[in-house]
Structure formats: structure tokens, C-alpha cells
Amino acid sequence: MGMRPPAGLPSLSKRSRVLLVLALVVAALLLVGPRLISTYTDWLWFGEVGFRGVFTTVLITRLLLFLVVGVVVGGIVWLALLLAYRSRPVFVPVSGPNDPVARYRTTVMTRLRLFGLAIPIAVGLLAGLIAQSSWVTVQLFVNGGAFGVADPEFGLDVGFYTFDLPFYRFVLNWLFVAVLLAFFASLVTHYIFGGLKLAGRGGALTNAARVQLAVLAGTFILLKAVAYWFDRYSLLSSSRKEPTFTGGSYTDMNAVLQAKLILLAIAVICAGAFFAAIFLRDLRIPAMATALLVLSSILVGAVWPLVVEQFSVRPNAADKESAYIERNIAATRQAYGITDDKVEYQDYQGYGTKPPRDVPADVMTIENTRLLDPNILSRTFTQQQQLKNFYGFPPTLDIDRYDIDGQLRDYIVAARELSSKSLTGNQTDWINKHTVYTHGNGLVAAPANRVNAAAGESAEEAANSNSGYPVYMVSDIASQEAGNQVIPVQQPRIYYGEVIADTDADYAIVGGSGGSDPREYDTDTSRYTYTGSGGVPIGNWFNRLAFAAKYTERNILFSGAIGSDSKIIYNRDPRDRVTHVAPWLTADGDSYPAVVDGKVVWIVDAYTTLQDYPYAQRSSLDGLVEDSIDQNTGRLLPRKEVSYIRNSVKATVDAYDGTVKLYQVDQNDPVLDAWMGVFPDAVQPADSIPDELRAHFRYPEDLFKVQREMLAKYHVDDPKEFFTNNAFWSVPSDPTIDTSANQPPYYVLVGDPETGKPSFNLTSAMVGYSREFLSAYLSVKSDPENYGKFTVLQLPTDTQTQGPQQTQNSMISDPRVASERTLLERSNKIQYGNLLTLPIADGGILYVEPMYTERSSTGPNTSTFPQLSRVLVSYREPPPSNSVRVGYAPTLAQALDQVFGAGTGSVATAPSAEEGTPPETGTTPPVDQGAAPAPTAPATPPSGTDVSAAVAELDASLDALTSAQRSGDFAAYGAALARVQKAVAAYEAIPK
């Protein structure tokens, strides 16, 4: 009786096949359609900003990678399937009516061409999609050059490790994938068509199956041998000793390196054993070779290095690792730009030897001491300079400097931007939101060392006066028309900015048909039509359809507000625009506005980075730059591991037309050279930077924070001392907040010790490792002539100079501060501003901290915002006293006179509202424009009796105030309060 052939899979009806095809088409459109629309709109956008060459280069590179890797991987799999099918046995015995393989064999045979092509094509498509994302690796390999620095182990140029080795790894990994997939495809094919039988005790292989599988297995192991060879070079970025140091350690160089060579030799032997199986039927030889490779990988590759580490290195770690730590120190300094030619170390005693008024640089420092904190005053700017509810300022303002009337001063600056989140009521209608409220209005600046008037002497006067506010200089539409701009701006309209872009759909539609009335809000009495070059034309129906689909907004398609000359403005965040046109750069977390040649431009710092610079310390960018400001704003660099960073590019984004320009500022960066080879016209050379723009360049905060973390460890030269951590520094915690976040660095305008002229520096205090005393002071210059020059003041290891946290504690615990704080907190919220650390008095350290008060809200419609009420200063006296003197007064001048004696504070900038525009406070009463307080009388040394009596009276008055409050006697309470104020004033009147 004949055996019934196995049944195939049930066939689909014609209707089912049609529905299946339609479903596949719809799915493809849903998957591919958005990508095509995004590609088309990106093509339009890159053309608008003049960087279409970047778009096409990246696109072509991705397509070529997709095709090459897809064809190679898919082709190898297809060839393996073809060979396995063609070498199948002629007669395939069926094991029985329930043979499961026969069922699948019949299915494959009925759709042979489908399976033979669909599988390789699917594999190739998937491989190509994954591989195309590695376009950066390929372009750096093609365009990368030499660093001119050789590694200490193999003597190869660093460029090999950063440009070549990643590409070789990329190729090797895809060959691994292709061979492995081909092996499994061959295995399954031979099994289905009878070349491989699993029935019986040992199974069976046909000669063809044995040869094909042996060749593929041998090739895979041969590739593994090549991988062992490249693994040797990867040891120079080993993480075995992290976080102590990155790079090859003693164990890596004396155990793992040799193990890689041994395993390489064993892998070659093992591959030879598999190739021998082509001629020998006995598979025990390749099986034993495989077992040898696995066993060797465990014993030689893992156990041996572990033994060396545990029994040779750990008992003598400082000596064994010394040479490798030395390599790490040298490489890290090179990779992070903190080599000795860029960093000047100076010994600094920590206490002064001269009166500040006798040091020319100190006079300049005191005159420009910053009292306004850009991290606190955003709400003050908003309340006094917002003008309309739909304008706004960023939560953290910026600092820049301007030369006005021959005087260089630092200013708190912010663009008055459109805030879409603040639109209310009918303002949120699509027409209004996207075609009427389209732009901001002007730049607002305030001298950082000045307020409109000093706060009152008593706590009650300080809390209720209209003093302590910024002195504004406004460059907007109104001031332009009036012709009274201190900082002249020709085009004050802001179409691109940080606040504008702080919404999901940040687009604006500008322009219209010829002759149409202006639509965009400009002022209460005027409307405006955009005339800039920015924006993508959407006057034609095809572009309107594309953007309607992009934003899923039908109004773009049907709105009558869109005419033949209309354009759509989007990607309005300056940082996003820079990273779009230069995807190979990492943008700094903060962009800042500056007026250059009469235009408001955003300046964005951009970095080139590498992940595996040999022996350089590897760190996470987001972890290094996070501080108390970033925790509040969420302004962080991406989560990215780096071991090399350079601020090689400064970018500008025009606030009116969105024009992006990239400038080369580091001509010795091989990474930037490579990218300039990829995109020849993207970055403009350094000599094309206008001098007016260069004058506004700041040393970037994020780079400085990365470098200060490195300098905290890598200022140490001795590798053995490095290993013990004894000489390390730490970034101090921010004493003005409750969390333990790092204190941010601060921009300050100080006197240059060599010239006495003002110098714009970025600075940070450093404390000892797990200590609070000050250990070092870092500063880096932003002046064009000395840009990027580091100065590190190193204090003695036994210093008694207080660090920021100790200084804060000593200042707020001072009796004058503590007593008045108690009074102020009854009806005010107190905020301490940036605690500045300033070298002064030829060896001393002066701390300056503004104190802001904000009245507690008394009603639902009452607006409150911070105002400068007091200034605290702290200074350590020279030995043998070493005592810490604290100044506390409404003005910096008075506080300095309390510490240094009369006359020192006379050079400080007095409160005044003469310069700039008075604040527009809305419902707030006008600010008192009165003159600055008269200078204090010359100080005389206080007697112990005077101080004791004043303190005793202060304590007694506070006790009386507490008793009166408990008794509920309002008359007694008023008398007690007056007594406290009188006691505080008497204490403050005592010369300190």
C-alpha cells in the first residue's frame, strides 16, 4: 500500500490574498510615509539654512552603507541557501506518515523562490537598516588623519585608535553576523532537505552538508582569530581599573595581552581543524579543537588574568600600576586640553598681605563685583520687562560683557522671547498662535554690578522698599523707534530662541500674499510682516500638504492666512539648529544672546568628542556637567561616554532669520579636521570670525565643568600619590541650596594681576578631597587675546582658608545676619545668590554673596519677585589671627568697609538708576531713584566692651520681642520690634 504524501499548508482564497496585499500596502505606507515626508521637509529645511550639502552627504553615506552591508550580508545568506539546496540528496527517505520535516519540505518546495529570495532580502534589509546608523564611523575612517601622538605601548598614532580601529571592528562585526546567519541558514536547509538527519544514535551528515558547515564554522573561528588581534589594541581603553583610571593596566599588558596572542594561535589551529573536515569524515577533530578553544578562553583568557590580578598586582598595586597610571595622566591631560602649556599652576597662600585698595587689579575686581545672580532674577526680569503676557524670559538668564563708552562691563542679558505656553484664551487659537504671535521683542540687559537703589538699613525697610532691582538697558522696538538704545540693535524682533522653541509644535507661519495686510503682532498699535530670509516656502500646495502631514494639522492646508509668499519657520531652538546642520557636534547646554554688528545672534558652543582615546579617562558627559543649576533647569548634555573633548566650533544663529554659521576656533583638533574633510564647506575658518563676534565669545561652562573634574585628579604628577587619592580635590557643593549638588562655575569680570585691566573669566573654587577647606581656585580667561588660558591657584595642604560651604555657614551664623534673617523671614522668602570666590589682597580670598528677599504673597493677584536686599562678604585675616571677618550691609561698599576698614568700599559701584531704562513694574510702585547711601565714616578698631554690650542688647531685644509676641500685646510687640531694629543698627555701626 502506497504512503500518503504529507499535506501542505492551506491555500488562501483570492479575496483573502487581495485583502492581505491591501493590508501590506497600508502598513508599508504607515511605516514609510512619515519617513518620506520627514526626509522631504528636512531637505527643504537644509536648503533654507544653506547646509543641504550636509544633508545629501549624510543621506548618501547612509544609503551606501545600507546597500553595501545589506547586499553583502543578504548575499552571503542567499549563497549559503543556494549551495545547501543544490547539494541536497536526490532521494530523501520519509521516516513515516507523521514526519514533521516532510510537511515543511513540501511547503518550501511549493514556494521555493519565495523562501529562497524573501529570507536573504529580509536579512539584508534588516542588516542595512542597522548598519546605516554607523555612518559616522565610516566617514571618520575615510577622512581621519594623524594626531601626531603615538601610544606608549604599540607606538601607533592615536588616529589609528580613534579613526581606523572602530571601522575595522565595524567590518568584522558584520562579517561575524553574515557568517553566523549563513551557518544557521545552511544548517536548517540541510536539515529540511535531508542533508542532516538527527534520527538514530549519532545522526548523519551528507558530504556536501559536512563540507559547507565546516567551511562556515572554520571561517567564523578564523574571524575570531582576527578579532583577538584587534582586541590587543582595545586594551589601551580597558575599563578594568575604572574608576581609578582608564587604560591598559599591569594585568592587561602582562597577562591579557599575551592571552590574546595565545588564543589567536589556538583559534587559527581550530579553524584549520574545521577546514580539515572538508577532506576527513571524522568530525571529532574539529569538535576537540572547539573544546580546546572554549577551555583556553576560560583558562587563558579569564583565569590567568584573574590570578595575576589577585596574587601579583593587588598586594603591590601602587608599584605595579605606577607606569600605567603615568600613561593615563599624560593621555588624559592631552585628551581634555589640560596640558601644562595650557594650564599655569601658582602657589597661593590663602591670606592677604596688602590692602585691596593698594592693588590695582583688586580695585578693578571690586568695582566689577557681580551682585546680580542670573539664576535668580528671571522672575524679576519677567515682572518688570515682560510687557505682554505672551513674552517671557528663560528660567536662567545669561552673562555677557559689552564695551560701552570705553568701559568693559559684564551684564545680565536675556532676549524677550515669545512664550507660546503663556498664551491664554483666544490667543491659543491656531490662527493667533501660529500666524499672529510669531516673535519676541528685543534684548534686555542689566549691569551685573549695580542695582537701582540700595535697600533700607532696617529689615522692615529692606523688605518693603522698591530697591535692589536691576538697572535695565532695553534694545527693543520701542527704544529703536525712540532712538535711545544703549546697545544699538537694528532688528530687535526675535523669531528664534530658547523660550520660543519650548513647545512641541514651535512653528510659525509668516509672510502672505503680495499686498496683504500685516498680520503679526508687533506692538499694540502696529502689525508686521516678516521680511527675513528664514523659513521654508509653503505657498505651493505640495509643500502645504507635506507640512500638514508633518504636523498633522489640517489648518495648514486650508487656512486662508497662508498665501503665495508664506513661509513656515520651525526648528527654532538655536542649539537644535546647530546640531541639525552639524550632527557630528555636541552642543553646549546653554546658548546665549549677543548683539553683534547691530543684530541679535545666539552663540552656541559646540564640541568634538571621541569615546576611546587610548589611556585617557572615560567619563559620562551628563554626569560631569550636572550641578545645582542643571538640576533645576534640566539643561544637561546628552548621556554620552567620552574620553576626548574639544570646543573646536563656535556657532551663531541669527535671532531674526535663523541663519546658522559655524566657525573654527581650534586649529589643532584632528577630529574637526576630519569632519571638515567630510563637509568641506560647513565650517568657516578661524580668520573669518568678525572681531566684534570674537569679543563676545565665552569659555563654555560645560567644557569647564568637565575640565575641572579632570583637574581635580589630574593635577597630580606623581602616579603613586595619584593612586592614594590624598592630593585630589573635589568640586564643592553649592552652599546656597539644600541638596548636595555641585556648585556651578561663575563668570566674573576681575582685574588682571599683570595688567590691572578687566578680564572676563570663568572660575570655580575647589576643596580638598572629602574636606571643606579651600584647596585650589581655577580660572580660565575668555578675553580674545588670552582665550582658554587656565590659571590654577594652589593653596597649602594645611590651609585654614574656608571653602564655600564653611564660608556660608560662618556668614549666616553671624549675629547680625541671624537676627535680621529672623525678622525678614516673617514676611519674606530669602534666597542667597551666587557665592563668588575672588582672589584679592595679594594672596587672600574674598567671598561675596548677594542676599535676595521676596515678599510673601498676600493675595491671589499679587506678584512678588526677588530683590537685592543685602550683601555678605567674608575674608580671612592673615596669621597669627587667622580669624574670619564678615561684612553684612545693604551695599557692597558698606560690607567691604566693615571688613577692610573705611575706603576699600569706595571703589565699588554704587547703586544708581542713571544708566539705562528704569524698570517697568506694571502694578509695582515706581522704583526709588534716590542717590546712593553716603559713605561710612572711617572705621576705628572696636573695643571688646562695645561689641559685648551691643551683642547683649541684641540678645535682650530678641528675648523681649519673643515675649511680646507670646503675650499678644501689640503695643509691646511694636516697642520690642523697634528695640530690635535699634539694636541691630547699633551693632552694625560698630567698626569691625
Swiss-Prot record:
Residues 908-934 have a biased composition (Low complexity). Residues 904-948 are annotated as: Disordered. It comes from the Bacteria. The chain crosses the membrane at residues 18-38, 63-83, 114-134, 174-194, 211-231, 260-280, 288-308. One of its GO terms (cellular component) is extracellular region. The keyword Iron does not apply. It is found in: Cell membrane. Its main location: membrane. Signal peptide: none annotated. Pfam families: UPF0182. Keywords: Cell membrane, Membrane, Transmembrane, Transmembrane helix. It is a multi-pass membrane protein. Belongs to the UPF0182 family. This is UPF0182 protein RHA1_ro06389. It comes from Rhodococcus jostii (strain RHA1).
